[in-house]
Amino acid sequence: MTAELAIYEKFIDAGIPHYCGADSFALNGAFCGYGVDYAKLGVETADMVIEVLQGADPATTPIKTFDNGIVTVNTETAEALGIDYSGFAEKCTSVVETVTAEEFE
């Protein structure tokens, strides 16, 4: 993600919100990262596995999709761009706030 550290300020200077597909980009300066709610995905996957182990036919197991996920917003970048991101809350499982870091756990 070090590449993000090299470009995020250029997006801010240009007034462009940079949207990404992973939270790690927001941790490195992008406006926000949007991705799958892996906890919810894990629960749904486990439920499907239980059904199959109890005799359900995998060929007839319905496909499940998710209509929301987790958005990680870099609050420093949002402030620099003057963006109110409160509208994300009603469309996502959760909104995680972060600030720019060169390293993260």
Spans of features found by a protein language model:
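Short hydrophobic alpha-helices and adjacent helix-cap/hinge residues
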Residues: 1-105
